């Protein structure tokens, strides 16, 4: 006797369950039927090993229950945390996630978007750095941290408020001369408001400050040169440092210690993101914490608003300060 190959058909499921083909179709497509009929179909499908052909169903319903996430990379802890939180938020709604890595490249982002559209996804969430990204008007599209235009919802944290919070926390902890360091892309995004909030707080309180704003491609050398010029014989001419990311804050803490300064006794440092240590669960450094889960939940909700009047072009979610050992409190 030969075994039948391939996935059983809906007709075979209907025969096994003793119901009509239409009833099987309703159960598979989540259309309400009597509980008795639903159980018969589910039991028959399980017995026969029937698997839903999602591609065929998407052709009928014009819906794939898949959302694409376009993200620069997964090596940065914040990007990894956001990707995980979005996957959780989508899973709660019965959606799968197609992840595409753009490497912060304009052409790469456009390819990622084209790939997502080829897969007939129901929407796209993107952390994009491409000012010329071509987005079709019919595509459900939400960005994180980069405002494109008023028709595309952008979800971010309160970056301006976070910069202000960091400066004022350093002042509260006794710092008298502050420094801001940034490493990032050349494309303006919501995170660039951190320096504006920092500068406003310094000016408002009459605190002297300096800034070093660099492109990530420049590497560590310009930061090292700055520290060499401003730390002499173990004494720095600044006592409070705010970095635009936790990762940069940790690198600078190491570089400052190499030059004979103590952290936090001589120089207090605050980062931004709220990245936790994988083993201990504590914060890597004192930091302005982004509400990662709330950002993810808001981005997913913004893809499918119940009322179009609820769509906001820019949503800035609140941040908070957390101690992580690189400040005195």
What does each model-identified segment do?
Residues 1-5, 9, 69-168, 172, ...:
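Alpha-helical recognition/docking segments in bacterial nutrient-uptake
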Residues 1-64, 328:
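N-terminal helix-turn-helix DNA-binding module of bacterial transcription factors
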Residues 21-25, 59-73, 177-184:
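Short beta-strand segments enriched in small/hydrophobic residues
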Residues 40, 78-92, 162-165, 189-208, ...:
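Short, solvent-exposed amphipathic alpha-helices that sit
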Residues 90-101, 199-222:
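Short beta-strand elements in bilobed, periplasmic/extracellular small-molecule ligand-binding domains
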Residues 153-180, 220-229, 249, 289-308:
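Hydrophobic alpha-helical segments within soluble ligand-binding/sensing domains
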Residues 166-209, 311-328:
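An alpha-beta-alpha
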Residues 228-329:
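Flexible loop/turn connectors
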């Amino acid at each position: 006797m030969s075994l039948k190959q391939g996935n059983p058909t809906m007709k075979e499921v209907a025969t096994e369950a003793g119901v009509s083909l239409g009833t099987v179709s309703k159960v598979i497509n989540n259309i309400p039927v009597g509980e008795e009929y639903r159980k018969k179909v589910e039991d028959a499908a399980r017995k026969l090993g029937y698997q839903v052909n999602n591609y065929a169903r998407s052709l009928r319903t014009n819906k794939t229950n898949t959302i694409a996430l376009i993200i620069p990379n997964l090596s940065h802890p914040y990007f990894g945390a956001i990707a995980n939180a979005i996957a959780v938020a989508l899973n709660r709604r019965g959606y799968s996630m197609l992840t595409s890595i753009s490497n912060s490249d304009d052409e790469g982002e456009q390819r990622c978007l084209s790939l997502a559209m080829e897969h007939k996804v129901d929407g796209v969430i993107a952390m994009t750095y491409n000012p010329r990204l071509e987005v079709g008007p019919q595509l459900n599209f939400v960005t994180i941290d980069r405002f494109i235009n008023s028709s595309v919802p952008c979800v971010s944290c309160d970056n301006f408020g976070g910069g202000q919070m960091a400066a004022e926390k350093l002042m509260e902890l006794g710092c008298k001369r502050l420094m801001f360091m940034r490493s990032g892309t050349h494309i303006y995004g919501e995170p660039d408001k951190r320096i504006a909030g920092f500068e406003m707080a310094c000016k408002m309180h009459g605190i002297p400050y300096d800034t070093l704003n660099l492109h990530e491609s420049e590497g560590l050398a310009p930061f090292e040169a700055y520290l060499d010029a401003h730390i002499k014989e173990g004494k720095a001419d600044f006592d409070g440092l705010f970095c635009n990311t936790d990762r940069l804050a940790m690198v600078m803490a190491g570089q400052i210690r190499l030059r004979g300064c103590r952290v936090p006794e001589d120089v207090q440092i605050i980062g931004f993101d709220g990245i936790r240590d994988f083993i201990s669960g504590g914060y890597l450094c004192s930091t302005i914490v982004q509400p990662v889960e709330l950002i993810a939940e808001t981005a997913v909700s913004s893809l499918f608003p119940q009322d179009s009047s609820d769509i906001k072009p820019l949503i800035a979610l609140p941040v908070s300060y957390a101690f992580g050992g690189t400040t005195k409190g």
